[in-house]
A protein has these predicted regions:
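Aromatic- and Gly/Pro-enriched helix-to-coil junctions and flexible linker segments
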Residues: 11-115
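Sec-dependent signal peptide recognition
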Residues: 1-8
């Protein structure tokens, strides 16, 4: 029954929501959600919901849908500005390209993220 529900849910999703669930959610969950979530919103930003990414954090909104080069998230994950996230090395270029594509296409959300 659970598999049937998931199959029906996948059919009802928009392509943008499917892209988020399959490509973006794993990146945000693995790279961001541990420190930036509802309970621990380091830097004033939580990655567990779209609204938080759109509102002003300590450095402004994390994303500007349709405008990846104006999105603070991309600057941070590329390690180009003052804030370098996640700590350590920048994200792999493949992940940065996926995030850029997601933002360029409107940064639509899919299923709720869980850490």
């Amino acid at each position: 029954m659970h598999a049937t529900y998931l199959a029906l849910l996948a059919l009802c999703q928009t392509p943008e929501a499917r892209f988020f669930d399959q490509r973006i959610a794993p990146i945000l969950t693995k790279r961001c959600l541990g420190c930036h979530n509802y309970e621990l919103s380091d830097g004033g930003i939580a990655f567990d919901n779209r609204d938080s990414l759109l509102k002003k954090g300590l450095h402004g909104p994390a994303i500007t849908p349709g405008k990846p080069e104006q999105s603070y998230l991309l600057e941070a994950v590329r390690h180009k500005g003052d804030v370098k996230m996640p700590p350590g090395l920048p994200l792999p270029s493949k992940e940065i390209k996926l995030l850029r594509k997601w933002i360029l296409n409107g940064a639509q959300w899919g299923s709720k993220l869980r850490n």
